[in-house]
């Protein structure tokens, strides 16, 4: 049975380097790894706890099912104002109110920019609060070297 990884780019930008990382991971995955590239961040409504009930918005339901069906998550996030993008945080907020889809799930975090350390730390803290398992990230210096 293949390992299923849900890969998410935290950017909506057309020429996003984080989306390029996610697409490269999908293209280079070994045969025993299935990469499900999630491209629905723009479709998610703004998080509102009052709307976190049945019937769920179809985009929210789709995100939750895809996280539930994944063995692990791979998130590549840009950094905006020393934090993660609003659309990525919005998606994570929708997972807080779910049925624990992300609890205990391994999550790998990467940033395509070498100076995105604040977003990495912010995202790691959010995911710890959500009880996911931090699978570590790739630390590198300003030149991109580990």
Identify the residue ranges that each predicted region occupies.
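Helix-loop-strand module that forms the ligand-binding subsite of alpha/beta enzymes
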Residues: 55-130
